[in-house]
Every structure is written in structure tokens, then in C-alpha cells.
Regions:
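Basic nucleic-acid-binding interfaces
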Residues: 1-149
Length: 149
């Protein structure tokens, strides 16, 4: 082939350290916007970013040179520095790990809706329940002793 064509959508999920409620409603819109800017700066497209006080969901389209681990590292690292600087949240940090799940183009609208409705969704389900469902639906083997750090 003369050219390379990709369609790489990732649903990335990570929480605040110890799932502390740092991303309060008064700062969340700014945090989500800033993370969208980080994505753009690194040749990604943030299709939807959202979450609740203790975790984030980001649906991004990424170039093939970025591995999921790099995507998580970039989003977490740059946003953490900015959150410390912008809001003086000295104890804030993201958890060490993350989840990254591929999304087919045909499922992008459903994932966007899912992320937009996080607040409603978490009236019925905890982050831990939600995350376990993602792992199970994706067929990812895990040991629960090492999930929550």
C-alpha cells in the first residue's frame, strides 16, 4: 500500500490516588478541557472526556505511534502538574495504573454517551463495580488483590 490508514480509538480510565474525591464539580470542566488540550498537543483527538470526583474516562483517537501506555502517561503526567499548579491541590495525584480499552468506530457514539452520563451512572454503581465490568467484558484476566493498590 502507498499510504497508512488507521482508526485507533481508546477508552482510557484512571482514578485519583486512593480514589480520593479531588475532581470536584467546581473544577471538573476546566480539568476535562485541559486534558483535551493535552491530547491535541500530542496528536490525539479527545472525542469525549469526563468522569466524577474520583476518576476520569477519556475517549481518544490516537496515531499509531502512541501506545496506550504512552497515552495514559501523557494525560496523567501533564494534567497532574497542571492541577497542582492551577488549583494548589498539594495532595493530588492520579493512581499508578490505568485501563485502556479499544473501541470500534461503530461504538464511538455509545462510549461518548456513556462518558457524558457518568454522574448519573455512578448514582447506581461504584467505580470499582464499573471497572470490574470493563475488565470482565474485555476478557482481561486480573487478580483483585492488585487492582486497587
Amino acid at each position: 500500500m502507498a499510504n497508512t490508514y488507521t482508526s485507533l480509538h481508546y477508552h482510557v480510565i484512571f482514578s485519583t490516588k486512593n480514589r480520593e474525591p479531588w475532581i470536584t464539580p467546581d473544577i471538573e470542566a476546566r480539568v476535562w478541557r485541559f486534558i483535551g488540550g493535552i491530547a491535541r498537543k500530542h496528536a490525539m483527538t479527545a472525542l469525549q472526556i469526563g468522569g466524577v470526583e474520583d476518576h476520569l474516562h477519556a475517549l481518544v483517537t490516537a496515531p499509531p505511534i502512541l501506545a496506550p501506555s504512552q497515552i495514559a502517561q501523557i494525560l496523567k503526567g501533564e494534567s497532574s502538574k497542571w492541577i497542582h499548579r492551577e488549583f494548589q491541590l498539594k495532595g493530588f495525584s492520579w493512581q499508578d495504573g490505568y485501563g485502556a480499552f479499544t473501541v470500534s468506530t461503530s461504538n464511538v457514539p455509545q462510549v461518548i454517551s456513556y462518558i457524558q452520563n457518568q454522574r448519573e451512572h455512578h448514582r447506581r454503581k461504584t467505580f470499582q463495580e464499573e471497572y470490574l465490568e470493563f475488565l470482565q467484558a474485555s476478557g482481561i484476566k486480573y487478580d483483585e488483590r492488585y487492582l486497587w493498590g
